[in-house]
Design a protein with these regions (language model features):
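Glycine-rich, aromatic-bearing surface loops/beta-hairpins
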Residues: 80-138
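Structural motif
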Residues: 22-25, 42-44, 69-78, 96-99, ...
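Long, hydrophobic N-terminal alpha-helical segment
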Residues: 1-48
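Conserved active-site and cofactor/substrate-binding residues in soluble primary-metabolism enzymes
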Residues: 2, 6-10, 19, 50-57, ...
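A phosphate-binding glycine/aspartate-rich beta-alpha loop in the early core of alpha/beta enzymes
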Residues: 36, 40-70
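Short, solvent-exposed amphipathic alpha-helical segments in soluble enzyme
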Residues: 30-35, 40-42, 63, 88-90, ...
Length: 138
């Protein structure tokens, strides 16, 4: 039996193939994962039902499996910061700043970037609950 938190074989395999500078997208249930990622991006569909798992559930497991060098989030534009951003900061222990990208800039980054190795779809219902992680060195 594995002694790590991540037990999903497809996810473990994908993480093992990530290298420095590769990116991992964890997206909410509203994110157009098929049309806003490249054909070379491995996609894992973890959503079981509405709200399960959440983006933060997945982030908590990943953060113990990889080093994160950079984190980017999708902002709704002007107005209040989404509450989930505070949760993101708490989970990553403020080790890296959350770089904010506008909605369409985030989509473009996800679609055009050839180094997005993995995209994980969740059942998250909160809006703007998407985070793009850049894998750091060990």
């Amino acid at each position: 039996m594995l002694k790590i938190k991540c037990l999903n074989p497809q996810l473990i395999n994908a993480l093992a193939h990530c290298g420095h500078g590769d990116k991992i997208l964890i997206c909410d249930g509203n994110y157009p994962i098929d049309s806003c990622t490249s054909e070379t991006t491995e996609k894992i569909y973890l959503q079981l039902t509405h709200g399960i798992p959440t983006v933060t559930d997945v982030l908590k497991v990943l953060i113990e499996s990889i080093n994160v060098e950079k984190a980017q989030v999708m902002t709704p534009g002007e107005g209040q910061e989404p509450e989930i951003f505070k949760e993101f900061r708490g989970i990553i222990n403020n080790k890296v700043e959350l770089d904010e990208l506008g909605r369409f800039e985030f989509y473009d980054e996800s679609k055009k970037s050839n180094n997005i190795r993995l995209a994980i779809a969740t059942g998250e219902k909160r809006t703007f609950a998407n985070i793009l992680l850049t894998v750091g060195v060990a």
